Amino acid sequence: MNIRDLEYLVALSEFKHFRRAADSCNVSQPTLSGQIRKLEDELGIILLERTSRKVLFTQSGMLLVDQARTVLREVKLLKEMASNQGKEMTGPLHIGLIPTVGPYLLPYIVPTLKETFPDLEVFLYEAQTHQLLEQLETGRLDCAIVARVPETEAFIEVPIFDEKMLLAVSEQHPWASKSKIAMNTLKGQEMLMLDDGHCLRNQALDYCFTAGAKEDSHFQATSLETLRNMVAANAGITFMPELAVLNEGTRKGVKYIPCHSPEPARTIALVYRPGSPLRNRYERVANAISEQVKSILANKK
């Protein structure tokens, strides 16, 4: 048994899918499957139920996964302690980002991180919030950039910036000529939403509840770009994060309208494990990102 075997086991518990777990570990599916079997043989226990098409862990398997998470956390802590003895801003840094932030934030911050911290080797991963927090908990990620939600309170949260939500409507929509819109104007309206798993979905539902709007039950999107295209086709209206519209204008047939009373917004934060000896590293990275994003948002006004 080695650390890599435990990483395979935890990845399989996270993704509940052999191929996706193997991809996340950068190995082939047969390699991961073979190592899981070897682990079973070594321990003399059955970890998985192999009579189902789904990945189901036995009771023994679930107990081992919990213990593996603990071991991996301690190994990560040991590595961080060793890293902290050398140069603080040197070495690998594994950062996770949510899909409603990553594509729009990375073009701005990657050059900044390379310039500000040239000795950091940055690895980037995109996944939904619950997956990122699981990977952060087990030590597969060093930190994550997410929207603050109750689930992130178990970690140290470093606010990076507050991101406004704009109302996206088609250029053909009756509201397209408005320069701003009060939230109570949305009362009774149906809103296009992302599908389950996206934290932005829950936040948007909260905005709708406040405004008296409701979800359009006929459609759920897997990405902001799908929502944007549905709006451009005049198939509905939705909320869009500020970063996602910075360079859009009406290029795609969509008008973005600021909302008020109240102004919908979310806080984007960098989160990391409590007790990490690399706290100062994460704080410095968060500060560099914050300064860059705030400068960009200020210049766009």
Regions found by a protein language model. Give the residues of each.
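Hydrophobic hinge/microswitch elements
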Residues: Q128-L141, V146-A147, G197-I257
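A short LG(V/I)-centered, amphipathic sequence patch enriched
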Residues: E40-F57
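A late-sequence structural motif
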Residues: L105, E171, K255-A298
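Flexible hinge/capping segments at coil-to-helix
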Residues: T152-M191
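Beta-alpha-beta core module
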Residues: E153-P159, E163-K164, K178, E225-G275
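Short helix-boundary/capping micro-motifs
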Residues: V10-S28, S52
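Central regulatory/effector-binding core of bacterial HTH transcription factors
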Residues: T90-E153, A221-S223
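Secondary-structure junction motif
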Residues: W175, E190-A211, L278-N287, Q292-K301
